[in-house]
A protein has these predicted regions:
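Primarily recognizes the serine-hydrolase "nucleophile elbow" in alpha/beta-hydrolase
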Residues: 1-6
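Active-site-adjacent substrate-binding region
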Residues: 8, 15-120
Length: 120
């Protein structure tokens, strides 16, 4: 028996680089774009580090999106520098602040998407 698809999914890809520039794809569904934008605003994050790509990004989220799942792909701008898929693409480029912010962003988004405790 085939399992039902989720309503939404978040894909984290290459989010730990020092000096990261997280971009979501231009084709991100509006519902997920609003959640992402709200999180940036409420967390006070810089638009230099958190923004929207000017182009479509083919990544692990695409098969979900093609099946009607609202997707949010948080991905570092891999064209920013000459490290991607080279010998420079290693643990030495990772930064604690990048992981901290990405974790905070992800939790903030999840709090918006998941139902809260029942009202009494």
């Amino acid at each position: 028996m085939r399992q039902p698809l989720p309503e939404w999914m978040i894909n984290l890809d290459m989010v730990g680089r020092q000096g990261k520039k997280i971009r979501i794809p231009a084709m991100t569904p509006q519902s997920m774009y609003r959640v992402y934008s709200r999180a940036i605003r409420e967390l006070g994050y810089s638009p230099e580090e958190w923004g929207v790509s000017g182009y479509a990004i083919l990544d692990d989220h695409v098969p979900f999106m093609e099946r009607g799942v609202d997707t949010l792909n948080l991905i570092d701008d891999f064209q920013d520098g000459n490290w991607w898929h080279t010998s420079k693409d290693n643990i030495g480029i990772l930064g604690e602040k990048s992981f901290q912010q990405t974790g905070e962003m992800t939790l903030h988004i999840l709090r918006q998407l998941l139902p809260g405790p029942p009202s009494t």
